[in-house]
Amino acid sequence: MTRFILASGSQIRADILRQAHIPFEIIKSDVDESVIKAERADLSPRDMALCLAEAKVEPVSLAHPDALVLGADQTMELDGELLDKLPQASLARARLERMRGRPHFLHSGLALLRAGQPVWRYQQTSTIHVRGFSDAFLDQYLENAGFALTASVGAYAYEGLGSQLFERVEGDYYAILGLPLLPLTAVLRDHGVLQQ
C-alpha cells in the first residue's frame, strides 16, 4: 500500500478519512495562509482554495517524497468577496446577519502531490442557501454554537447545530465539510492507497 499523508490540522478532514477507513498520517503544514492570501489577492475565492491547498501540501510532500500527500482548503464567498474565519466569536452576529436569507459559496480545493510534483488537483463548489431565520433563533444559535463560531469561516458547523441555518444546499455533503470524499477515494484507488 502506498503511504498517504494529510498535510492539514483540520479535525473534520481527519475524521472524514478515519470514518471512511482510509489509512493516513497527519503531518501538518506550517504555511501561513495570510501571507498567501495577501500575495495572491488577485485570485478568485474559488481559485484561492486550490492555491492554499497547493501551498500547504508542497513542503510536506518535498519532506516525504515516498508518500502521496494531500493538501486541502476551503474558502467562503459571499457577494464575490472572500471571507476569512472570524478572529473572535463576538463578530459572529454581524457575519450571520449578513448571510441571512442569502446564498453563499463554499469552494473546496484539493491537491495531491508526490515528491513535490502534482498528481491530482480538484475543485468543487457548493452553494449554501441560508434561511431567513429570526432574531430569536440567531440569539439561541449564538448562545449554543460554541467553537463553531470561530472554527469555520461561516460561523457554523454544517454537520451540527449549523444545519438549522439553511433552507437548502446544492453540493456534496463531504465537499461542504471541506473534503470531497468520492473523487478523492477514486484517485487514492488509482494510486495504491486503497484497493480497486
Curated annotation (Swiss-Prot):
Zinc-finger listed as a keyword: no
The primary site where this protein sits is: cytoplasm
| Pfam family for this entry, one | Maf
Q: Which GO terms describe its molecular function?
A: nucleoside triphosphate diphosphatase activity
> Which CDD domains does the record match to this protein?
Maf
**EC numbers, comma separated:** 3.6.1.9
Name the reaction it catalyses: a ribonucleoside 5'-triphosphate + H2O = a ribonucleoside 5'-phosphate + diphosphate + H(+); a 2'-deoxyribonucleoside 5'-triphosphate + H2O = a 2'-deoxyribonucleoside 5'-phosphate + diphosphate + H(+)
Q: Which UniProt keywords apply?
A: Cytoplasm, Hydrolase, Nucleotide metabolism
Q: Name one GO biological process term.
A: nucleotide metabolic process
Q: Is Membrane set as a keyword in this record?
A: no
Q: Which cofactor does it need?
A: a divalent metal cation
Give the GO cellular component terms, alphabetically: cytoplasm
Q: Domain of life, per the record?
A: Bacteria
Active site, per annotation: D73
Task: Say what the protein does.
Answer: Nucleoside triphosphate pyrophosphatase. May have a dual role in cell division arrest and in preventing the incorporation of modified nucleotides into cellular nucleic acids.
> Which protein family is it in?
Belongs to the Maf family.
Enumerate the PANTHER family for this protein: BIFUNCTIONAL DTTP/UTP PYROPHOSPHATASE/METHYLTRANSFERASE PROTEIN-RELATED, BIFUNCTIONAL DTTP_UTP PYROPHOSPHATASE_METHYLTRANSFERASE PROTEIN-RELATED
Could you tell me what this protein is called? Nucleoside triphosphate pyrophosphatase
Task: List the taxonomic lineage.
Answer: Bacteria, Pseudomonadati, Pseudomonadota, Alphaproteobacteria, Maricaulales
